[in-house]
């Protein structure tokens, strides 16, 4: 498997993208790039600095002074903000419920996309997000669009929150996920949408292993060409 391709995995909030992308990257010995974590890190930094996240100019001041780095931990990927490990704090509900607001700003997205493309320029990457196949890596050899029902995604996020010790309300999560879908799909810059050449994968009734197997089958098909 010497071929170093780019794999783009898109889909709505809590569709299981990052969980699956990490496993696929590990199987291929590829670099996993969690673009959602990049936007979460900006959101966290802005909240810490008490910046108005609706104000693009103020947000860009935050972005300019933020260095985001990824490091492979033992069983997970660690995210660093200016040298500080923020892997856990960027997953709190406070950040989760505001990240779509930060991500809707055109200048913020342009800068993040530039950084993401830089990370991916040599290939051998698995990148997940909302606009990877359509905007960040439009020439990716493999493009997957993962879907799951709002109910299923809320259940997954609820379990995730409980496991991390966060307060969690299932009905509230359903509302929040539906709201994030709306924000992500309706924003003017790089909205959430399936690339024309992406393969759609409904994961509602599939396990992580089954989704990974399906994606690996697609990747091996590309290698065989």
From Swiss-Prot:
Binding-site residues, ATP: 11-19
InterPro entries xrefs: Cytidylate_kin, Cytidylate_kinase_dom, P-loop_NTPase
Pfam families noted in UniProt: Cytidylate_kin (PF02224)
Endpoints of the signal sequence: none
SUPFAM superfamilies given in the database record: P-loop containing nucleoside triphosphate hydrolases (SSF52540)
GO cellular component term, pick one: cytosol
GO biological process, one term: nucleobase-containing small molecule interconversion
Reactions listed under catalytic activity: CMP + ATP = CDP + ADP; dCMP + ATP = dCDP + ADP
Cell compartment(s), UniProt: Cytoplasm
Its EC number(s): 2.7.4.25
Keywords: ATP-binding, Cytoplasm, Kinase, Nucleotide-binding, Transferase
One Gene Ontology term of the molecular function aspect: dCMP kinase activity
Similarity field: Belongs to the cytidylate kinase family. Type 1 subfamily.
Protein name: Cytidylate kinase
Gene name, Swiss-Prot/TrEMBL: cmk
């Amino acid at each position: 498997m010497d071929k170093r391709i780019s794999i783009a995995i898109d889909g709505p909030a809590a569709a299981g993208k990052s969980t699956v992308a990490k496993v696929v990257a590990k199987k291929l010995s590829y670099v996993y790039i969690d673009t959602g974590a990049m936007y979460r890190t900006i959101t966290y930094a802005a909240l810490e600095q008490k910046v108005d996240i609706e104000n693009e100019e103020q947000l860009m001041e935050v972005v300019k002074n933020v260095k985001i780095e990824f490091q492979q931990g033992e069983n997970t990927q660690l995210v660093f903000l200016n040298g500080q490990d923020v892997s856990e704090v960027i997953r709190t509900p406070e950040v989760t419920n505001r990240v779509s607001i930060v991500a809707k700003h055109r200048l913020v997205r342009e800068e993040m996309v530039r950084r993401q493309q830089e990370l991916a320029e040599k290939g051998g990457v698995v990148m997940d997000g909302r606009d990877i196949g359509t905007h960040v890596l439009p020439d990716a050899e493999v493009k997957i669009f993962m879907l799951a029902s709002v109910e299923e995604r809320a259940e997954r996020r609820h379990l995730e929150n409980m496991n991390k010790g966060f307060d969690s309300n299932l009905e509230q999560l359903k509302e929040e996920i539906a709201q994030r879908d709306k924000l992500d799909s309706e924003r003017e810059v790089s909205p959430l949408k399936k690339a024309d050449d992406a393969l759609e994968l409904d994961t509602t009734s599939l396990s992580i292993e089954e989704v990974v197997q399906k994606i690996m089958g697609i990747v091996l098909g590309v290698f065989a060409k």
